[in-house]
Amino acid sequence: MNLRPLQDRIIVKRVEEATMTAGGLYIPETAKEKPQQGEVVAVGNGKRGEDGKVYPIDLKVGDKVLFGKYAGSEVKLEGEDFLIMREDDILGVVEK
């Protein structure tokens, strides 16, 4: 992907939702909710403070993150769906 986010924005790829339940039932596309977690694929340089300094983002490429239901803007790049959001939209990082 050839897109570099600016300032405190990050690009996230949603994780794929399962199409079957643990009991073996098929979940149709219309019944699925979009997952609220994903993987960071690109990060900006950071947010510029009032003092003029750039404060780096606490996330790195590859981090698994949780975000709000309405966070970010959906974009399609090279046939794949991504979310562009601000660092403030991230609720937490999933630790391994």
Curated annotation (Swiss-Prot):
GO terms assigned for molecular function: ATP binding; metal ion binding; protein folding chaperone; protein-folding chaperone binding; unfolded protein binding
GO biological process: chaperone cofactor-dependent protein refolding
GO cellular component, one term: cytoplasm
Localization per record: Cytoplasm
Domain of life: Bacteria
Keywords: Chaperone, Cytoplasm
SMART domains documented for this protein: Cpn10
Keyword Cell membrane carried by entry: no
Pfam families membership: Cpn10
Keyword Membrane found: no
PROSITE patterns: CHAPERONINS_CPN10
PANTHER family in alphabetical order: 10 KDA HEAT SHOCK PROTEIN, CO-CHAPERONIN GROES
Protein function: Together with the chaperonin GroEL, plays an essential role in assisting protein folding. The GroEL-GroES system forms a nano-cage that allows encapsulation of the non-native substrate proteins and provides a physical environment optimized to promote and accelerate protein folding. GroES binds to the apical surface of the GroEL ring, thereby capping the opening of the GroEL channel.
Known partners and oligomeric status: Heptamer of 7 subunits arranged in a ring. Interacts with the chaperonin GroEL.
Membership in a protein family: Belongs to the GroES chaperonin family.
Protein name in the entry: Co-chaperonin GroES
Organism of derivation: Citrifermentans bemidjiense (strain ATCC BAA-1014 / DSM 16622 / JCM 12645 / Bem) (Geobacter bemidjiensis)
Gene: groES
